[in-house]
Design a protein with these regions (language model features):
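C-terminal catalytic histidine-bearing segment of alpha/beta-hydrolase fold enzymes
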Residues: 199, 292, 297-299, 324, ...
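Accessory cap/linker subdomain of secreted extracellular hydrolases
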Residues: 188-307
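Short, surface-exposed "cap/lid" segments of acyl-processing enzymes
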Residues: 44-47, 51, 58-93
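Catalytic-loop region of hydrolases
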Residues: 1-62
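Residue-level detector of functionally pivotal "anchor" positions at catalytic/ligand-binding pockets or at interdomain
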Residues: 378-409, 467
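Short beta-strand/loop motif that positions the catalytic acidic residue
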Residues: 315-322
């Protein structure tokens, strides 16, 4: 593994109080933010320098799990996590719950030159993974303030980031087995089926308001597939009246939001509705809808990310009211993955009471992820006296804690400590090997961490939700 870290620069700090206010729920840690520059491959496979954000909890006595967070669609080059703009709040909040969270800007955004290959699975995956390697190197580098990471890894992302997190998840399990211990993956509202579900959703007879996505896909894939799409130009894909605006976006003269409103206004004027299909030349539209061998369709199919079998715990969060990414992406992905033999994949609906659109779905999905990840998270002390023992059992229900400690610990000095979510020691008591029950009285705590020590060494740590 060649070195990935080029440099890291401190940007800002947020206290736990500030983050709690931002999140609307109490968090455990303040967080330091760093802009990280690192080496990764561009769409042509050439190594270059990209940028991303590292969010580090402010406690160097704890070894934290890593989290790979992939951001959703942004407005353009500067609207990225490392600029504390698009997509930085969620990784910041996740970090405050005890994760060293990495959020790549992606290729063609932030410091990475060129056109961003939008929803290009390979570069989204490698940009996210190479940032993980860079931040792990940073934790071992004496030139930076000390922080410590475990091998445990959590993966997540929303919207474009759901597609990107799924791509990174697949890469990590298939190309980097053993590099990280993937505890859980949470893919939220992602377009996993680019070539089928998203094409039907965007190019059908119904209005589709984020029409700029289509232009960015075309620009990005022409960049990523120069051989496959060698005969394609913007002029051969889009109707002439849309070309100037798409080129202005390509040249970074306008952002995606401005491009979207310009195309939307023209479609409303010409057709009375935002029909995405109407920006495409007729022969291009017909070929996309009818010919699987059409080069653009081949490129789209190459970026479907659902036809595999994740072995780690995987949740796909969706809203049926989603107006930008059809919820059928999550249903299809969960079904195909399960048929492929994935042991633990489920699609979870977030808008059971009333429909939520793409923006409204963020909050319930992200809150669910905090609890989903939290149930799997292991926080370890940064000291080296850790020998976790899978034979030790700690179980909790209705204020009753049950310990199952192998008799091999009979001669050890055993101590059980309970910590609150914000790291306070709630109780400490001596315990004995074998089976034992303990009444805890934890009415005021929503979540606790139980840690068992043998002769001062941590041998088991387990997190429980108490209500």
């Amino acid at each position: 593994q060649a070195q990935k870290l080029e440099s890291a620069q401190f940007i800002n700090s947020f206290s736990s109080q500030e983050i709690s206010t931002l999140a609307g729920i109490p968090v455990a840690y303040g967080v330091d933010l760093y802009k990280v520059r690192y080496y990764t491959s561009d769409a042509r496979g050439e190594e270059h320098i990209a940028s991303g954000l590292a969010c580090i909890p402010q406690d160097d006595t704890v070894r934290f799990p890593l989290a790979c967070y992939q951001h959703g669609t942004v407005d353009g080059r500067e609207d990225v996590p490392s600029r504390l703009a698009g997509g930085y709040q969620l990784p910041l909040i996740l970090s405050a719950f005890g994760y060293v969270t990495c959020a790549a800007d992606f290729v063609g955004l932030g410091d990475s030159p060129g056109i961003h290959p939008y929803v290009h699975a390979t570069t989204q995956a490698t940009a996210g993974i190479d940032l993980l390697f860079a931040v792990r190197e940073m934790s071992e580098d004496d030139n930076y303030p000390p922080f410590y990471v475990t091998d445990q890894l959590f993966i997540g992302g929303y919207s474009q980031g759901g597609h990107a997190s799924m791509a990174a998840h697949k890469y990590l399990e298939t190309m980097y087995p053993g590099e990280f211990d993937i505890a859980a993956a949470a893919h939220m509202s992602g377009p996993y089926s680019i070539s089928e579900v998203m094409i039907d959703f965007t190019l059908g007879d119904q209005p589709y308001n984020t029409v700029s996505y289509l232009a960015w896909v075309a620009l990005g894939y022409m960049e990523a597939y120069p051989e496959l799409l060698d005969t394609f130009t913007l002029e051969k894909v889009f109707k002439p009246e849309y070309l100037d605006d798409i080129k202005a976006f390509r040249d970074e003269a306008i952002g995606r939001g401005e491009l979207n409103s310009r195309i939307t206004n023209r479609l409303m004027t010409d057709y009375g509705a935002v029909l995405c299909r109407e920006i495409l030349l007729e022969d291009v539209l017909n070929s996309i809808l009818s010919d699987p061998e059409y080069p653009l369709n081949q490129a789209l199919m190459d970026n479907d990310v659902y036809d595999w079998a994740p072995q780690s715990l995987t949740n796909l969060y969706y809203c049926e009211g989603d107006d930008q990414v059809s919820f059928e992406n999550a249903i299809l992905a969960a079904n195909v993955m399960t048929q492929n033999g994935a042991p633990n994949v489920q699609a979870l609906r977030m808008d059971n009471t009333f429909p939520l659109n793409h923006v409204q779905c963020v909050s319930p999905a992200a809150t669910s992820v905090v609890f989903f990840w939290g149930s799997m998270q292991q926080l370890l002390t940064s000291a080296n006296d850790i020998e976790l023992d899978d034979e030790v059992g700690i179980y909790y229900a209705n204020d009753l804690l049950i310990l199952d400690i192998p008799v091999s610990y009979s001669s050890s000095d055993l101590e059980l400590k309970a910590y609150s979510l914000d790291g306070r020691l709630i109780s400490s008591r001596p315990v004995a090997a074998g089976m034992s029950e303990h009444l805890m009285n934890l009415d005021s705590e929503s979540m606790i961490v139980m840690s068992l020590f043998a002769d001062g060494r941590l041998i088991k740590t387990q997190k429980f939700f108490t209500r």
